[in-house]
Curated annotation (Swiss-Prot):
It comes from Lychas mucronatus. It is found in: Secreted. Belongs to the long (4 C-C) scorpion toxin superfamily. Sodium channel inhibitor family. Alpha subfamily. Residues 21-80 form the LCN-type CS-alpha/beta domain. Binds voltage-independently at site-3 of voltage-gated sodium channels (Nav) and inhibits the inactivation of the activated channels, thereby blocking neuronal transmission. This is Neurotoxin LmNaTx19. Keywords: Disulfide bond, Ion channel impairing toxin, Neurotoxin, Secreted, Signal, Toxin, Voltage-gated sodium channel impairing toxin. SMART domains: Knot1. Disulfide bonds join 31-79, 35-55, 41-62, 45-64.
Length: 90
């Protein structure tokens, strides 16, 4: 009986754990969010429920820390591809 209580308690602890990840934010057309300053990225990351964020100037992209698992942090390297056709939206 004690083992059952211990197993249930451990399962509840595992279920309650929310995993967080770090990474670059991508928009709906697989482009990273460009930046020049940390404040913009901090606000953008916080709006996505991240713990924090900053502008990584080497890539001019917003990098977020502590993002929820459901946020997109990987792209397909096809930023904006197929979004415009001869200057007009599809």
């Amino acid at each position: 009986m004690n083992h059952l209580i211990l197993i249930v308690a451990m399962c509840l602890m595992v279920i309650g754990v929310q995993c967080l990840k770090d990474g670059y934010l991508y928009d709906d057309v697989d482009c990273k969010f460009s930046c020049w300053d940390n404040e913009y990225c901090r606000k953008l990351c916080k709006s996505k429920k991240a713990v924090g964020g900053y502008c990584w100037r080497w890539r001019f992209s917003c990098y977020c820390t502590g993002l929820p698992d459901n946020e997109k942090t990987e792209g397909t390297y096809k930023c904006g591809q197929g979004r415009f056709l001869m200057g007009k939206d599809k």
